[in-house]
Amino acid sequence: MAVNWTKELTDQLDFHWNFLVHRKLEGLTDDEYFWEPVAGCWTVRPRKSDDEPGTGPFTIDFAFPEPTPPPVTTIAWRLGHILVGVLGARIASHFGGAPIGYETYPYPGTAAEALSELDKFYAQWVAGVQTLDEAGLARPCGPAEGPYAEYPMATLVLHIHRELIHHCAEVLLLRDLYRSRS
């Protein structure tokens, strides 16, 4: 029996998205979005100067290299990372999306804006993956993936799905902690 790997890859992510993530994000409030569970969290915050990352009225905290240990992050930061570093950059590099980067992205200032962007980027990613046939999944990722340029696209797709599952789980845990705080 032949296996349609593109369908398997998208079905796995769609199941996770539709049954474990998307509906659990419904009703996310701005208070939850910006909640800092500990002092010193990385987050998305109102811009104070033009030299901060991003464009528009909000910026995101980040540093290269990342500090050790990395700071605890807010839901706003996690969603910003998913939008730019996980989905947006790969949509731009591999599926014809608009260029995107931490320094140039207009970070969402509300939970509703972030979830709208997440829905849009998720749909673009899945649509892009659905264009990959067996040969497309086997071809090298190319220079956009730096030292992983020679890895097959299937490896990148699996990595992005793992990242999306991982970071969305963190977002949902933060939401649970917010709801259960004393």
Residue map of PLM features:
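Acidic/histidine-rich alpha-helical segments that form the ligand environment
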Residues: 105-138, 155-165
